[in-house]
């Protein structure tokens, strides 16, 4: 998400971008994740994160997605789920929507219950849940403590074998939300005309 928008600072000639589950500035990623790990302490740490990024990345550290939006005439599609627990929706989508909701260059797709890593998947395809439920039963059937350090290698091999023997690759590979991807294609096709 962040990268495809930030690149507009350097390549304003890009015709269209689709930003998924992203954030406005690089430090937002640390802040969003840090809130769940450190609570409000993250706000005291954020200035140090920004200084570190400035030393490490120089001028690039201060770039934002919104700077990129202002630097281009590209069409922008922003997609995020309200329940994203990796990057909070307030770090990107909400800010962008507030500023650009009336700008015809922008298209917004907001989901309520797709999280971060499942945003592209069809919510009606339950195969992942089915596979995980069976996997959990398999875990319970093991005759050893798979979390113990001495069983780490054994578990790695057993897990790989279980997955190879039980994963239905056809069902797994058809989890994408095809209607969403048709929207993506339509968006790009319209933008490049």
Where are these regions (language model features)?
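Catalytic nucleophile loop
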Residues: 1-2
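Hydrolase active-site cap/lid region
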Residues: 6-58
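Active-site nucleophile elbow and catalytic-triad environment of alpha/beta-hydrolase enzymes
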Residues: 52-68, 74
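Short beta-strand/loop motif that positions the catalytic acidic residue
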Residues: 72-73, 78-84
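Short alpha-helix in the alpha/beta-hydrolase fold that links the catalytic acid
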Residues: 74, 88-99, 123-124
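Acidic catalytic loop of the alpha/beta-hydrolase fold
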Residues: 82-87, 116-118
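Short glycine-rich catalytic loops that host catalytic nucleophiles or stabilize transition states
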Residues: 109-114
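Catalytic active-site module of serine/aspartate enzymes centered on a nucleophile-bearing elbow/loop
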Residues: 123-193
């Amino acid at each position: 998400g962040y990268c495809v928008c930030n690149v507009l600072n350097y390549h304003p000639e890009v015709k269209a971008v689709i930003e998924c589950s992203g954030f406005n500035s690089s430090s937002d990623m640390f802040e969003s994740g840090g809130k769940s790990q450190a609570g409000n302490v993250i706000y005291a740490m954020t200035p140090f994160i920004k200084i570190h990024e400035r030393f490490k990345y120089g001028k690039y550290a201060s770039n934002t997605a919104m700077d990129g939006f202002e630097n281009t005439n590209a069409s922008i599609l922003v997609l995020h789920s309200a329940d994203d627990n990796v990057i909070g929706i307030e770090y990107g989508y909400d800010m962008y929507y507030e500023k650009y909701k009336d700008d015809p260059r922008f298209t917004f797709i907001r989901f309520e219950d797709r999280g971060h890593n499942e945003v592209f998947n069809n919510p009606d395809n339950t195969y992942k849940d089915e596979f995980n439920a069976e996997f959990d039963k398999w875990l319970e059937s093991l005759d050893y403590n798979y979390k113990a350090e001495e069983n780490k290698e054994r578990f790695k091999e057993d897990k790989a074998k279980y997955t190879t023997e039980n994963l239905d690759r056809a069902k797994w590979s058809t989890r994408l939300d095809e209607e969403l991807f048709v929207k993506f294609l339509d968006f790009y096709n319209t933008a490049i005309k």
